[in-house]
Amino acid sequence: MSATASVATRHDWSLAEVRALFEQPFNDLLFQAQTVHRAHFDPNRVQVSTLLSIKTGACPEDCKYCPQSGHYNTGLDKEKLMEVQKVLEAAAEAKAIGSTRFCMGAAWKHPSAKDMPYVLEMVKGVKKLGLETCMTLGRLTQEQTQALADAGLDYYNHNLDTSPEFYGNIITTRTYSERLQTLAYVREAGMKICSGGILGMGESVDDRAGLLIQLANLPEHPESVPINMLVKVKGTPLAEEKDVDPFDFIRTLAVARIMMPKSHVRLSAGREQMNEQMQALAFMAGANSIFYGEKLLTTKNPQAEKDMQLFARLGIKPEEREEHADEVHQAAIEQALVEQRESKLFYNAASA
């Protein structure tokens, strides 16, 4: 397949086609991915997001990779839903260090009715700070999805994790079809989709291909596709899994870029385990989004300063959003924080 042949957006990928991409010589695959990438993006710009865990631990799901699952003893303390004000303060800090998108994650099977007002207030508050908003709250009803859209949520993250064939080996408390249904609700409500998967759970190359096929063959490609490397946490069933070969990880990023040419492909969890050379290869393969800051939910993430140093060495700059002038934007931040302190939803969000 020529480097330009896969620039067009497609939704009809077959396993044989995707397998052929994975089997290309490494240099040919990276050349094709970089060519596709340059057709749609500035190759020297990377979108920067910050992720905050707004509710940690005791999740009823049994995802074998996750330290937040209540099924496993990982030493992670259960925490209540964060106060709205604290979330906004964290968002303001993220803005100050260069993030353009603020992602909020809660360890839930699905959000409860009592928590939804606070979640919606978080979305509205973060939007006032001039950041794009993203949330991952588990499975959603159609009504909850619409409420989030009405509050101004830009992105909803709901990963497929792996192929349909391998999925049952990793999760039994939520079906693949339920995940796809949530994505359908998100799209129907007019929000953007963030959905990807995890490498290193014992899956085959065909499973990696199957995951990408599920994502690329959706009616519309996800705007953001996070590709995670398993972070092995003691106490989870996958703690002793074999490490992913770095070249296999880069291959998956490259194939994702070719199959979903207009999507942001995010270098997500597991980045702390990657040296600078591997991260540089990831950007060459078409990754153009990262999580930035001190923590990625409950696992470590490279320090923000190191990220900017690497960007400088590679000649990469963060993507920018159109926004207010600095003075106006700072005033907007301060006003949003004042309004939030005065809100009746400010105190003890978990006890409502």
Curated annotation (Swiss-Prot):
[4Fe-4S] cluster binds at C59, C63, C66. Residues 44-262 form the Radical SAM core domain. Its cofactor is [4Fe-4S] cluster; [2Fe-2S] cluster. It catalyses: (4R,5S)-dethiobiotin + (sulfur carrier)-SH + 2 reduced [2Fe-2S]-[ferredoxin] + 2 S-adenosyl-L-methionine = (sulfur carrier)-H + biotin + 2 5'-deoxyadenosine + 2 L-methionine + 2 oxidized [2Fe-2S]-[ferredoxin]. Signal peptide: none annotated. Its EC number is 2.8.1.6. GO terms for molecular function: 2 iron, 2 sulfur cluster binding; 4 iron, 4 sulfur cluster binding; biotin synthase activity; iron ion binding. Binds 1 [4Fe-4S] cluster. The cluster is coordinated with 3 cysteines and an exchangeable S-adenosyl-L-methionine. Binds 1 [2Fe-2S] cluster. The cluster is coordinated with 3 cysteines and 1 arginine. Keywords: 2Fe-2S, 4Fe-4S, Biotin biosynthesis, Iron, Iron-sulfur, Metal-binding, S-adenosyl-L-methionine, Transferase. [2Fe-2S] cluster binds at C103, C134, C194, R266. It comes from the Bacteria. Catalyzes the conversion of dethiobiotin (DTB) to biotin by the insertion of a sulfur atom into dethiobiotin via a radical-based mechanism. Belongs to the radical SAM superfamily. Biotin synthase family. This is Biotin synthase. It comes from Pseudomonas aeruginosa (strain ATCC 15692 / DSM 22644 / CIP 104116 / JCM 14847 / LMG 12228 / 1C / PRS 101 / PAO1). The lineage of its organism: Bacteria, Pseudomonadati, Pseudomonadota, Gammaproteobacteria, Pseudomonadales.
